[in-house]
Swiss-Prot record:
This is DNA replication and repair protein RecF. GO terms for biological process: DNA replication; DNA synthesis involved in DNA repair; double-strand break repair; SOS response. The RecF protein is involved in DNA metabolism; it is required for DNA replication and normal SOS inducibility. RecF binds preferentially to single-stranded, linear DNA. It also seems to bind ATP. HAMAP family: RecF. The gene is recF. It comes from the Bacteria.
Length: 365
C-alpha cells in the first residue's frame, strides 16, 4: 500500500497544505522546528487516530484554531481508499470512503504504518506503559478485533476502578460480576498479545541475527501479571489472581492485576537487553521495526508504510545499508532529515520536499 495524497488543515504548524507523494521514497528536508516531524505525525495520526508524540489531542490543533482536518488517499491492491479525520474540542470523527466510522476498530487497519524514531530506544529502556502502547499500536493495525477487545477491557477496568474509589461499602456480588467481565475481555487481550509476541519474535530473531553478523540471538518474552503458562486455564488463573489481589485492590482503590499491568522483555543471547550498549539497543530496535514490516506483510498481504524520523544519521553504515535494502523494495518510505549528506546511498526514484515554516515544496525528483 502507499499514500498517494495528504491534505492537512490546521494541523500543528500547517495552516493548509496539500501534497502528492512518491510511491517509493519521500524525503522531508529542512532545519529543525520547521514541521518535518509534524508531517510524519500527520501520516501516523491519519493511520492510527493517535499521535506518537503527545497524549493530548488538542496539542495537534493549530494554536489559533479550534479544529483540524486530515485526509488522505491510500492505494492498495484492492483499489483506492479515502481516509479522513476531523478533530475538534469535542472529539474526533473518522471516515473511510467518506462514511463515518462508529468504532476505532472499524477505522484502524486501512492504512498500516511502521514508525522508527529516536525515542523508540525507550522501547528497551523505558517504562512498561511504553511497551504496552507499542503492542497496542502494532497489533491493532493487523487485528481489528484486538482493538475491540482492548476497548471493552479498558471500559470494564474503568468501571471497576471507579467503583473501588467511590463505593462507601463494597457489594462483593457486584464486584464479582465486574471481575467476570474483566476476565472475559482480559483473557482475549492476553491471548492476542501472546500470539503477536511469538510471531514478532520469530521475524525479529532472523532480522537481528543478520544485523549482528550472526553473533547475537534475539528473544522476546511476554510478561503478563497473570500466569499464562497454561492457555487452557488462563481464565481460571486470572480469576484466582483477582481474588488474591482483592484486599490489595480495596485498600489502594485500583486494580492490581490484568493486561493493563503487562510488560515485555527483550533478551540478547539470553541476557536482558536493557543492560546492553547503545549500539545494541539501536540494532535491536531496528530489528524489531524490520520484523514488524514482514509480520504485517505476512498477515495483510500489503506492505506497510515506513516512517523514519531523523534516524538515518543515528545509524552506522551496516545498519543504514540494512535499512536501505528494505527501502529499495516495494515499500513506501518517508524520511525526515536536516541534511542529505549522510543519505548518498538512497534509491534514485525519490521525491524531496523542502519543509519551511509549515509549508512543503517539491524540489527534486
Amino acid at each position: 500500500m502507499w499514500l498517494q495524497h495528504l491534505s492537512l488543515k490546521t494541523f500543528r504548524n500547517y495552516k493548509e497544505t496539500k501534497i502528492d507523494f512518491n510511491p517509493k521514497l519521500n524525503v522531508f528536508l529542512g532545519r529543525n522546528a520547521q514541521g518535518k516531524t509534524n508531517m510524519l505525525e500527520a501520516i501516523y495520526f491519519l493511520a492510527l487516530t493517535r499521535s506518537h508524540r503527545t497524549q493530548t489531542d488538542k496539542n495537534l490543533i493549530h494554536f489559533d484554531e479550534e479544529q483540524l482536518h486530515l485526509s488522505g488517499l491510500v492505494q492498495k491492491k484492492t483499489g483506492s481508499i479515502p481516509l479522513e479525520i476531523e478533530l475538534t474540542q469535542k472529539g474526533r470523527v473518522t471516515k473511510v470512503n467518506h462514511l463515518k466510522q462508529a468504532r476505532l476498530s472499524d477505522y484502524v487497519g486501512h492504512m498500516n504504518v511502521v514508525l522508527f524514531a529516536p525515542e523508540d530506544l525507550q522501547l528497551i529502556k523505558g517504562a512498561p506503559s511504553i511497551r504496552r502502547k507499542f503492542i497496542d499500536m502494532e497489533l491493532g493495525q493487523i487485528k481489528p478485533i484486538y482493538l475491540s477487545d482492548l476497548t471493552n477491557y479498558n471500559h470494564i477496568l474503568k468501571q471497576r476502578n471507579t467503583y473501588l474509589k467511590s463505593a462507601q461499602k463494597i457489594d462483593e456480588t457486584f464486584l464479582s460480576v465486574l471481575d467476570d467481565q474483566l476476565v472475559d475481555y482480559g483473557c482475549r487481550v492476553m491471548n492476542h498479545r501472546l500470539d503477536f509476541i511469538k510471531k514478532l519474535e520469530s521475524f525479529g530473531r532472523k532480522k537481528h541475527f543478520e544485523l549482528s553478523n550472526q553473533i547475537e540471538e534475539l528473544s522476546i518474552s511476554y510478561q503478563p501479571s497473570v500466569n499464562i503458562t497454561d492457555k487452557q486455564n488462563l481464565s481460571e488463573s486470572f480469576k484466582i489472581a483477582l481474588e488474591k489481589s482483592r484486599s490489595r485492590d480495596l485498600f489502594k482503590k485500583n486494580t492490581g492485576v490484568g493486561p493493563h499491568r503487562d510488560d515485555i522483555s527483550f533478551y540478547i543471547n539470553g541476557m536482558d537487553a536493557s543492560f546492553g550498549s547503545q549500539g545494541q539497543h539501536r540494532s535491536l530496535v531496528l530489528s524489531i521495526k524490520l520484523a514488524e514490516i514482514e509480520l504485517m506483510e505476512s498477515i495483510t498481504t500489503e506492505s506497510p508504510i515506513l516512517l523514519l524520523d531523523d534516524v538515518m544519521s543515528e545509524l552506522d553504515n551496516t545498519r543504514q545499508l540494512k535499512l536501505l535494502e528494505t527501502i529499495s523494495q516495494s515499500i513506501q518510505t518517508f524520511i525526515t532529515t536536516t541534511s542529505l549528506d549522510h543519505l548518498q546511498n538512497l534509491p534514485e526514484n525519490l521525491s524531496i520536499f523542502t519543509i519551511q515554516d509549515g509549508k512543503a515544496a517539491v524540489n527534486g525528483n
